[in-house]
Amino acid sequence: MGLPEINIAFQSKAETAIKRSANGIVALILRDATKGDITSYSYTNESEVVKSHWTTANYDYISKTFLGGPQRVIVERIGAEDTYDDALARLKNKKWNYLAIPSLADNEKDIADWIIAQRSAKKTFKAVLPYAANNEGIINFATNDIKVGTKVYTTAEYCCRIAGLLAGLPMTEGATYQTLAEVESITESTTPDDDIDGGKFILINDGEKVKVGRGVNSLVTLSGDKTEDMKKIKIIDSLDLIRDDIKASFEENYINVVNSHENKMLFIGAINQYFKSLQSQGVLYDGADCKAYIDVESQREWLAQKYDVSGMTDSEIEVANTGSIIFAGADITIQDCI
């Protein structure tokens, strides 16, 4: 506990960031009445899945998810007539990265809205859905008739495979041109460039193999802090991991520490060391000045609600007492892939 541990915690997180980013967790919601006494499952590999606990189709969805190499697959079971609300309530306080629901047919918007609401509440959940949500937290998978062996999958059914693929990628790799070796054929887009520009995650066939066209999410409309690079899954995944790391280190090592200016600067310094380590590993762009800082402007606005700060300099604002609140900001540039 305490400040001496902050640098150690951040350094540890930076050193393991790439490995941890390739160990993402997929959450599945499956309709299945085979074994109704258990509603939640957690598997670290396919061999742990008991076939008799699931229908043939659902066992296949779990297997397809593991093809991408996620660290873990969480499965929430619901009955044939149940809504998704109970499963989402169980998932709300669990740790995971990507959600997929193979049976999804009419509730795409509801699920997308739930994900967007969770992200607004500082969760880093994302979902692969057959739905154009115009949001960086939703991957709009838009390829149909995916033939694997004797089975042809719908778009919704194969979202689990895409979720597993994305969860298994490290921050140093993008999804673009990742091969799905098991796929024999698809219904190919006649306008792939337009689809990608429209926020669709599609598969393409180059004549030899089926692969991801480009690793984009469903974000299309740019405004404010929604910039062009936020259309890319790799960028959002990296931002999410960095956000989670900083939040976790703050909660583990800084809560209940005296909120003096000196301690604020120690915490900011620890974040900056973390950023430097990520730059050296190629996660953050090494040509950018990636840094955290006291957000003087936000701090001034907060103080102005309590007393007149019009005559105070930025330096005076920076060292002013802010109670239990830290006003911190950061400017970083994620390293993109070619």
Language-model-derived ranges and their functions:
Residues 1-136:
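Small-residue-rich
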Residues 1-61, 173-176, 195, 200-338:
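Structured, hydrophobic secondary-structure cores that serve as assembly/anchoring elements
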Residues 83-252, 256, 283, 290-297:
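A glycine- and small-residue-enriched flexible loop/hinge signal that marks low-structured segments
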